[in-house]
Amino acid sequence: MKQISNYDAAIIGAGASGLAAALTVKKYKPGASVLVLEKKERAAKKLAATGNGRCNLSNEACENKDVVFGFFSENGIMLRKDESGRFYPCSEDAGQLASLLTEETVSAGVRIRLDSEVKKVEACPEGGFLLLVEEKGAERTVYAKKLLIAAGGK
């Protein structure tokens, strides 16, 4: 019988949304075991290329821009608005932001597994989810009480 890894929460996708979700879980439930599964070889890979490498995070028309500012500020990332109303990190370096967000997530106690593609998700009758994960050619099973899919696009 295969060994099953158990987590309070699993997040599929280590992009900006997945990492932000993981940080938020740890903020409100510091003792929770959180796993982020990413099929690519690097977390926040697309984030590192956004906004021509400057990382356009939001804009003035965003309904909840205070929430966006608050999240980034709490995680040590200061934003600025350009003349067109777009928000960027003060560093204007998307790669630096991707690295910082990944480091903050790991520092918070979140486990990030790269090269880990989720092949199947099954809801358990008693609650929670079983995930079949292919990781570097081997299959493993993960059980999570809660599941968030933040897989993004192709």
Go through the PLM ranges and name each one.
Residues K2-S17:
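Beta1/beta-strand and adjacent pyrophosphate-binding region of the FAD-binding site
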Residues A10, K26-A49:
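Glycine-rich FAD pyrophosphate-binding loop
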Residues A43-L47, N64, F69-F71, N75-Y88:
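A short alpha-helix-loop-beta-strand transition element characteristic
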Residues E63, E83-E103, R113, K154:
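Short beta-strand to alpha-helix junction loop
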